[in-house]
């Protein structure tokens, strides 16, 4: 009887392991998941970047559907009727089927127990989390890049994540924090704000872009820049609640970024300015576009929250 019980237990365990292996999504797969199921791999985001998007969506609601479609790898939104609902995909259409443009999709790593860890998309998904009519239960499609579910424990899992540079273990002051202090969910109430991360975002195409030569942009690229800039820029010198002060801060960040030689290291990131897409000359026209089209939304949304 004891032998039978032991054998049965082994069989059940083997079947459970096999079932988990079969159900665990593998690298390259595209899967649907609710935002609340995603575990962040960073404790901070740039709130101002998200404020810009939320302000834009409030003024032009159709832009939220563009965000949804593009993030699902479906191109822009196609037909968006007046009563379309982000939580009901059948109420509107996107240009292409899910996953047609995988390069635009957000990415996850599968961890122990099948938990999904978001590695790219914290800003886009927090924007949708905070968007009226979307929220934590909104379902989105993501792309699996790695399966680390066979890690024997969380300590090993996080070691693998750090080795692969798929986790950002710093707070909004640039201080190191342990994986256990990462938030369990997205959203403003769970994440910290890193203003420098936002300022770097607003220099995109003006001071940095996609790495050249076909190189793949490292995860957390803007955070590497922001963490270095923490030692270079005194944000206290700028009134970030006024458009003029915010523009001046963006320009100061942009000028400092382009001052780095292509081969120069960006702080202790382990990457050079070239590897992080750094430009050698400031693109004034792109900077002016940001000043005119993005900064006003940031300032207005900041005021609406006070």
Residue ranges with predicted function:
Residues 245-306:
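A cross-kingdom marker for long, charged
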Residues 20-22:
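Boundary of Sec targeting at the N-terminus
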Residues 136-178:
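Charge-dense polyanion-binding interfaces
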Residues 14-18:
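N-terminal signal peptide c-region/cleavage motif recognized by signal peptidases
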Residues 164-265:
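Active-site-proximal loop/hinge segments that shape catalytic or ion-binding/gating pockets
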Residues 122-136:
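Short active-site loop/helix that positions an aromatic residue
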Residues 1-7:
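Bacterial N-terminal signal peptides that target proteins for export
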Residues 24-115, 123:
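Short alpha-helix boundary/capping and kink motifs at helix termini
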């Amino acid at each position: 009887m004891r032998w039978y019980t032991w054998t049965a237990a082994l069989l059940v365990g083997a079947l459970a392991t096999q079932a988990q292996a079969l159900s665990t999504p593998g690298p390259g797969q595209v899967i649907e998941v609710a935002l609340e199921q995603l575990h962040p791999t960073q404790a901070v985001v740039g709130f101002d970047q998200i404020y810009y998007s939320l302000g834009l969506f409030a003024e032009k609601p159709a832009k939220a559907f563009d965000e949804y479609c593009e993030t699902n790898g479906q191109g822009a939104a196609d037909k968006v009727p007046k009563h379309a609902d982000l939580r009901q995909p059948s109420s509107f259409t996107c240009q292409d089927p899910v996953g047609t443009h995988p390069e635009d999709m957000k990415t996850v790593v599968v961890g122990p127990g099948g938990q999904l860890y978001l590695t790219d998309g914290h800003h886009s998904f927090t924007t949708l989390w905070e968007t009226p009519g979307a929220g934590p239960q909104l379902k989105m499609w993501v792309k699996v890049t790695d399966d680390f579910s066979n890690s024997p424990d969380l300590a090993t899992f996080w070691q693998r994540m750090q080795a692969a540079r798929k986790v950002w273990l710093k707070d909004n002051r640039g201080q190191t924090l342990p994986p256990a202090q990462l938030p369990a969910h997205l959203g403003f109430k769970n994440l910290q704000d890193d203003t420098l991360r936002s300022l770097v975002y607003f220099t995109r195409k003006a001071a940095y872009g996609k790495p050249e030569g076909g190189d793949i942009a490292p995860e957390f690229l803007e955070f590497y820049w922001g963490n270095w800039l923490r030692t270079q820029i005194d944000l206290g010198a700028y009134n970030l609640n006024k458009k003029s002060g915010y523009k001046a801060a963006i320009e100061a960040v942009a000028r400092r970024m382009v001052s780095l030689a292509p081969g120069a290291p960006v702080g202790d990131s382990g990457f050079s300015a070239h590897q992080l897409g750094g430009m050698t000359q400031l693109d004034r026209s792109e900077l002016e576009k940001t000043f005119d089209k993005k900064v006003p939304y940031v300032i207005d949304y900041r005021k609406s929250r006070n």
